[in-house]
């Protein structure tokens, strides 16, 4: 049960990333289709997914799933996997399964991307948290398992009182090979020394991503050094925000020559920009792993993110590419270091996230119980690095 495709979002590539792994693993997969309101692949109402488009696609997709269930095509031997926990029309599943024989009740897994358990999610900005948290409790009553992207998200789910089994997949679905294909292969990764001194920002320009912190960093850089550096904003659509003051400030800074805005860019063009960037910077309050880190790490960029929520796990507790939240001084000094040379562990983050879909498959097949965070010892795994990194003695 995949998400509808948006040009400016990762859903355009998500099916491809999943499909490659499903085929390699030899799975018998049915991709349940949905209907779209139009062919624009654009977000018109809302920030993350289009409000009308998500509802229309999700409900039409559920209609097709219900038809398959009614025809006996879905049985207890099957798994229904929802790419997003928020699926309009999903309440039809317990309504049906509570009334059919046990042999017609499939296992159901949902992947959570944020929602009401995250105090910085957009559902709180728009006042949706009350009904969304109720929706989440409903889903917990009938699913086989919920997939979290990291240990900190697991903790948020547990303190919210979620009752379904929770699994940490430790990453977002990502296809490193597909991303490299878009730049013509790894041979086309531009050498770090040949790249301009450029720091990029690729998060949405909404308040939960703290774009003001990035602009403060730009101002600080201009005050402390005369060494040239381009600061760039990358946006799939026109630059916009749930706080228009950020856009106004960014446009004024661009007019003053302090930064460059690259908006309305397609994914391939974005990858070309990353291939000419030395550091991708992030300062988000709300970012559970983030595909931006995997893409930049794949294409030869250094990445500098806050040591906050999911990122210590994503970075395997790397002290050089994680800065103290929210210390602009620490961010500045580490940015300066990362502008000089490529980090010795470049590529390992994207390698790890490239295995996320395999971890999902293992869980769906009953082979991933070591990722199960049910029970009272779910915090035992927080400090452990999920993959090995190269250590350089001081």
Each PLM stretch: what is its role?
Residues 141-189, 194:
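Donor nucleotide-sugar binding/catalytic pocket of nucleotide-sugar-dependent glycosyltransferases
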Residues 326, 333, 337-390:
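A charged, aromatic-enriched C-terminal amphipathic alpha-helix characteristic of glycosyltransferases
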Residues 1-92:
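N-terminal pre-catalytic "stem/leader" segment of glycosyltransferase-like enzymes
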Residues 187-220, 231-232:
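Conserved donor-binding/catalytic core segment of Leloir-type glycosyltransferases
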Residues 125-146:
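Membrane-proximal helix-turn-helix segments that form the acceptor-binding/catalytic region
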Residues 284-286:
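Aromatic "clamp/platform" in nucleotide-sugar-dependent glycosyltransferases that forms part
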Residues 229-247, 263:
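Glycosyltransferase donor-sugar binding loop
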Residues 244-268:
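Nucleotide-activated donor-binding/catalytic signature segment of Leloir-type glycosyltransferases, i.e.
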């Amino acid at each position: 049960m995949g998400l509808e495709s948006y040009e400016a979002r990762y859903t355009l590539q998500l099916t491809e990333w999943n499909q490659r792994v499903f085929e390699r693993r030899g799975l018998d997969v049915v991709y349940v289709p949905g209907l779209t309101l139009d062919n624009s692949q654009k977000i018109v109402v809302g920030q993350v997914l289009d409000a009308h488009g998500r509802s229309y696609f999700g409900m039409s997709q559920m209609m097709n799933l219900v038809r398959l269930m009614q025809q006996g095509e879905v049985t207890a031997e099957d798994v229904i996997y929802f790419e997003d926990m928020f699926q309009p029309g999903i309440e039809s599943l317990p309504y049906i399964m509570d009334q059919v024989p046990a042999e017609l009740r499939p296992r159901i897994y949902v992947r959570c991307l944020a929602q009401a358990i995250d105090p910085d999610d957009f559902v709180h900005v728009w006042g949706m948290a009350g009904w969304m948290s109720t929706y989440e409790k409903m889903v917990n009553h009938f699913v086989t398992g919920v997939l979290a992207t990291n240990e900190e998200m697991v903790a948020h789910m547990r303190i919210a009182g979620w009752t379904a089994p929770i699994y940490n997949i430790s990453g977002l679905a990502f296809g490193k090979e597909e991303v490299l294909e878009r730049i013509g292969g790894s041979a086309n990764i531009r050498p770090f020394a040949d790249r301009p001194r450029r720091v990029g920002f690729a998060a949405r320009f909404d308040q939960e991503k703290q774009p003001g912190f990035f602009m403060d960093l730009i101002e600080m850089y201009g005050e402390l050094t005369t060494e040239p550096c381009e600061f760039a904003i990358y946006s799939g659509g026109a630059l916009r925000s749930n706080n228009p003051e950020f856009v106004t400030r960014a446009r004024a800074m661009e007019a003053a020559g302090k930064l460059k805005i690259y908006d309305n860019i397609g994914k391939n063009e974005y990858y070309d920009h990353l291939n000419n960037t030395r550091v991708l910077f992030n300062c988000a309050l709300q970012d559970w792993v983030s595909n931006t880190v995997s893409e930049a790490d794949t294409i030869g960029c250094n990445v500098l993110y806050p040591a906050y929520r999911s990122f210590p796990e994503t970075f395997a507790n790397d002290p050089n590419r994680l800065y103290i939240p929210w210390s602009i001084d620490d961010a500045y000094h580490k940015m300066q270091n990362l502008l000089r040379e490529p980090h010795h562990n470049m590529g390992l983050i994207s390698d790890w996230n490239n295995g996320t879909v395999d971890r999902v498959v293992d869980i769906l097949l009953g082979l991933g119980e070591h990722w199960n965070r049910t029970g009272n010892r779910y915090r035992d795994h927080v400090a452990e690095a999920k993959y090995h990194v190269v250590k350089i003695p001081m």
